[in-house]
């Protein structure tokens, strides 16, 4: 779709590509924060606000697209489509970074994150075992947590390309979900 209605002659696709660059940069920062807070459960709670910021950025981007290039009107489906495209392009930028980061910059990163996850479950198991004498529920959780630890230990560490593709597919999926809520809101200028 090459709709050109602004004086500079910018097409919708050009707008989406230019908007995807800063969004991809935000995704890279989000990945680094998530990556380096993986060992702390409380810092892991940052994921929800970061996802909310993604929704706000998508809303602002699609609203700007609507106002600058589409005469202030956009259908819900077109808004949803552009939002998913924006998440795809931004996700491609993030995926390229994730691949380069995990393959060349910090090749031990994925192993470290995997080992931190195993250590978190082992720490949780120790805590649950300490509570087992006081609670039947805690005692019933011990076999499940032990099984999860064994599964994690047996699971091979993801490669850099697997991680990049996984994050790209996550970005597209989250884009679909977020835009299902954002598209009806951004449809027309009030």
Q: What does each model-identified segment do?
A:
Residues 143-173:
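Individual transmembrane alpha-helix segments
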Residues 22-27, 86-98, 171, 175:
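Hydrophobic alpha-helical transmembrane segments in multi-pass membrane proteins
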Residues 68-88:
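Alpha-helical transmembrane segments with an aromatic anchor "belt"
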Residues 30, 34, 58-62, 94, ...:
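Structural signal for membrane-spanning alpha-helices in multi-pass inner-membrane proteins
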Residues 14, 18, 22, 81-93, ...:
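Alpha-helical transmembrane segments of multi-pass membrane proteins
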Residues 97-135:
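Functional transmembrane-helix hotspots
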Residues 175-190:
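Juxtamembrane interface at the cytosolic side of transmembrane helices
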Residues 1-70:
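Transmembrane alpha-helical insertion/packing segments
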